[in-house]
Amino acid sequence: MTVATGDPVDEAAALPGHPQDTYDPEADHECCERVVINISGLRFETQLKTLAQFPETLLGDPKKRMRYFDPLRNEYFFDRNRPSFDAILYYYQSGGRLRRPVNVPLDIFSEEIRFYELGEEAMEMFREDEGYIKEEERPLPENEFQRQVWLLFEYPESSGPARIIAIVSVMVILISIVSFCLETLPIFRDENEDMHGGGVTFHTYSNSTIGYQQSTSFTDPFFIVETLCIIWFSFEFLVRFFACPSKAGFFTNIMNIIDIVAIIPYFITLGTELAEKPEDAQQGQQAMSLAILRVIRLVRVFRIFKLSRHSKGLQILGQTLKASMRELGLLIFFLFIGVILFSSAVYFAEADERDSQFPSIPDAFWWAVVSMTTVGYGDMVPTTIGGKIVGSLCAIAGVLTIALPVPVIVSNFNYFYHRETEGEEQAQYLQVTSCPKIPSSPDLKKSRSASTISKSDYMEIQEGVNNSNEDFREENLKTANCTLANTNYVNITKMLTDV
């Protein structure tokens, strides 16, 4: 710290909340001390009263900032990010306004906020300004056994056995999906019509409907595979339910709802097959029951969403869609307006054409959707000049409509992607920390005679020597890997010896 005033004054008088005195804004002679802060070679100069506005922060508390004092140069030295300090100093000058410089990444600026100890309120304000979405708190069960089981099934990265369970779960999901797809192949189906009885599989086809009706055989390999998969899904679901910290919140989780949807169709199908009577085929009820079963069995395909529990990519996609619901709603609304307008326009443009492919406005909805989304399926095309002009305008309007909300959705995706990878990057790159070494008393006397520091600074250093040696010794033991080459603190003893 460099004192620019002629007479040193007690810095304690300029700090609000100090046990000896209080800060008086009317006393200008007590607030004219100026300090120099060196940020990796870039010097900033400000007044003590500016820093004293936030006494709980690193720069506002004399005890906290004294460890970074360089008595030889009479300044404070911080080996930190230089562009970020412009915003940090402005935070003090403006009385609490925090704005991130455009050339500073989000994660770096967040680390600077934590380093200078601006507080949780400043961090929350910064996150709100940057559009951060507050992460939901995930409580753990209080019971130790339930906590271990919950971590085992809910957090695959928590341990080796948890990873093994996650791998097994993924394999079972994939087997279930593959089985669901393979059982529809003609090679695995009996296409004899009106065969029923003894649990034999049968299928019915018609000219208007392409499909199959299947009666489950308990010896069928696909049924056995399906049963084994359901056993695992049910076991996994029940274990999660009994180990979860909140039973009520368990059923509000979208992932648990997907688990229920993946399990229920099997038991409904099994119950229907067991309750089916042979005379139902003659009563005309079998067709309806099989149609319902076909819809229920279709729900099995949603098991693929169970993979999102073990895939960060799918989780990021889901979070992006959830955060972009407003933009997606606007997109659908714009498309709806465009479909109505261009369907009506192309219908009236083609009304006089004898071979018109647009017999009504609702029939033109499909063409408008395909054109606005730039798919261009080609099953319905306008033939008149007016219809082609409407089609051209429809395609151009579709491109503009879809392009408007895309940047917002991409921005949300980038945010969630960087937030997911931030933890991994922090684990790989350790932040350089400072070694809090307190100089000895003789060195302090020499440094005080060799350089100009304020009375309050000297008192803080002397107090640290007398009262904090043990605390800093313990901290040094914890940070034994910290060397002089990577420290923010200046070794005063070595500097005076060199001089």
Curated annotation (Swiss-Prot):
Induction: Up-regulated in brain cortex in response to ischemia (at protein level). Down-regulated in dorsal root ganglion neurons after peripheral nerve injury (at protein level). Down-regulated in pulmonary artery myocytes in response to chronic moderate hypoxia. Its main location: membrane. A motif (Selectivity filter) lies at residues 374-379. Residues 183-221, 276-289, 348-361, 382-388 are extracellular. Residues 1-125 are annotated as: Tetramerization domain. Changing residue 360 to A: No effect on N-glycosylation. Abolishes channel activity of the homotetramer, but retains channel activity in the presence of a beta subunit. Changing residue 79 to N: Alters voltage-sensitive channel opening. It is a multi-pass membrane protein. The keyword ATP-binding does not apply. GO terms for biological process: action potential; cerebral cortex development; corpus callosum development; neuronal action potential; optic nerve development; optic nerve structural organization; potassium ion export across plasma membrane; potassium ion transmembrane transport. Disulfide bonds: none annotated. Inhibited by 4-aminopyridine (4-AP), dendrotoxin (DTX) and charybdotoxin (CTX), but not by tetraethylammonium (TEA). Inhibited by tityustoxin-K alpha (TsTX-Kalpha), a toxin that is highly specific for KCNA2. Inhibited by maurotoxin. Inhibited by kappaM conotoxins kappaM-RIIIJ and kappaM-RIIIK. Changing residue 99 to A: No effect on channel opening. The record marks 381 as: Important for binding with the scorpion mesomartoxin. A lipid is attached at residue 244 (S-palmitoyl cysteine). Residues 1-26 are annotated as: Disordered. The modification Phosphoserine is found at residues 434, 440-441, 449, 468. Residues 1-160, 244-254, 311-325, 418-499 are cytoplasmic. GO terms for cellular component: axon; axon initial segment; axon terminus; calyx of Held; dendrite; endoplasmic reticulum membrane; endosome; glutamatergic synapse. The delay or D-type current observed in hippocampus pyramidal neurons is probably mediated by potassium channels containing KCNA2 plus KCNA1 or other family members. It is activated at about -50 mV, i.e. below the action potential threshold, and is characterized by slow inactivation, extremely slow recovery from inactivation, sensitivity to dendrotoxin (DTX) and to 4-aminopyridine (4-AP). Belongs to the potassium channel family. A (Shaker) (TC 1.A.1.2) subfamily. Kv1.2/KCNA2 sub-subfamily. Homotetramer and heterotetramer with other channel-forming alpha subunits, such as KCNA1, KCNA4, KCNA5, KCNA6 and KCNA7. Channel activity is regulated by interaction with beta subunits, including KCNAB1 and KCNAB2. Identified in a complex with KCNA1 and KCNAB2. Identified in a complex with KCNA5 and KCNAB1. Identified in a complex with KCNA4 and FYN. Interacts (via C-terminus) with the PDZ domains of DLG1 and DLG2. Interacts with DLG4 (via PDZ domain). Interacts with PTK2B. Interacts (via C-terminus) with CTTN. Voltage-gated potassium channel that mediates transmembrane potassium transport in excitable membranes, primarily in the brain and the central nervous system, but also in the cardiovascular system. Prevents aberrant action potential firing and regulates neuronal output. Forms tetrameric potassium-selective channels through which potassium ions pass in accordance with their electrochemical gradient. The channel alternates between opened and closed conformations in response to the voltage difference across the membrane. This is Potassium voltage-gated channel subfamily A member 2.
